[in-house]
């Protein structure tokens, strides 16, 4: 009986080790778990220097997701650098709604009825892989399906109702305090700022190695 008991104990111990190994193999390692938490990769940055009225208020730096939405990012970068002979420099943010978003990019008319892309007047929605997860996400403004031009908006809250309707392509990495200053500027009954909100300078910042950011 003693030998049988010892044998049973050995079998049970071996079985426990096997089960433990299986559980260990099934559980995701730290790198896998972290990968699931990671969001899109920033491949390039763009900066805007803001002025409200005559007062400089600071710089906003955007991280753009060139692997997820390359065509949309290329458009935004080219308009920021002005490499095509037109773009965002000296244009205004024409629409500001507190607890929602701030909108700009109409460098032709300045009132939300103009603007154009580097591909022509309008270009199609690239994809809707990314969502409006929270404050600071940058997305294309449009007048309906496949009507992207140059206008864009920066969220100041989570705006889930826009998911699947507007192409998200970037996020504020630095300068969210500047976005808040713009968000809190006084506006008229049509959401136009009473003092001009101007992009006095803008450009591109290279990224040596793409990096992921959280979806928040």
From Swiss-Prot:
Q: Which UniProt keywords apply?
A: Acetylation, Endoplasmic reticulum, Isomerase, Rotamase, S-nitrosylation, Signal
- N6-acetyllysine modifications at: 165, 209
S-nitrosocysteine modifications at? 202
Q: Does the keyword Cell cycle apply?
A: no
The residues forming the signal peptide are: 1-33
Specify the domain of life of the species encoding this protein: Eukaryota
Documented activity regulation: Inhibited by cyclosporin A (CsA).
What is the catalytic activity of this protein?
[protein]-peptidylproline (omega=180) = [protein]-peptidylproline (omega=0)
Q: Family, per the entry?
A: Belongs to the cyclophilin-type PPIase family. PPIase B subfamily.
Q: What is this protein called?
A: Peptidyl-prolyl cis-trans isomerase B
Report the source organism: Rattus norvegicus (Rat)
